[in-house]
């Protein structure tokens, strides 16, 4: 039956420091992954699971806290691939801090998310935008 699937490990093309690692994306808290001030450029996030799982969908959550959401870069266009060589989904994410569902409907042991474009951070109350790409949570739903 369908249930949340938690990765056993992840890799990110970069992170701001250890406090902003990709593990924060599946810790069910409001901690975030942030890149190393690259504005989402060439971002790749890769998640590995203990077994091959049939993934129905994933849910991506930008920073819920409005100041972080406004001032950080956010993923816009993403490409999702897996260890199944012919599988690919491209999706344009909304520039908001609500949960966004993306249907996968594929078997995979590894899921890779590439950020192809981004929404820039914006000034807030006279404070400059951040240069970091930020994301709060990715939930994976599937059947093992």
Say what each PLM segment does.
Residues 45-47, 56-58, 113:
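Hydrophobic beta-strand segments within beta-rich accessory/binding domains
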Residues 50-51, 58, 105, 130:
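Generic detector of ordered secondary-structure context
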Residues 51-54, 110:
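Secondary-structure boundary elements
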């Amino acid at each position: 039956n369908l249930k949340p699937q938690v990765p056993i490990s992840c890799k990110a093309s970069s992170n701001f420091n250890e406090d902003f690692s990709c593990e924060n994306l599946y810790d069910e808290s409001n901690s975030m992954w942030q890149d190393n001030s690259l504005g989402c450029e060439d971002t790749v996030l890769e998640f590995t699971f203990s077994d091959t799982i049939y993934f129905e969908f994933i849910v991506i959550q930008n920073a819920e806290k409005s100041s972080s959401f406004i001032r950080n870069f956010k993923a816009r266009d993403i490409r999702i691939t897996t260890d199944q060589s012919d599988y690919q989904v491209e999706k344009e994410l909304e520039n908001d801090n609500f949960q966004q569902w993306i249907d996968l409907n594929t078997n995979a042991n590894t899921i890779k998310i590439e950020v192809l474009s981004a929404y820039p951070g914006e000034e807030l109350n006279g404070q400059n935008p951040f240069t970091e790409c930020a994301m709060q949570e990715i939930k994976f739903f599937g059947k093992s």
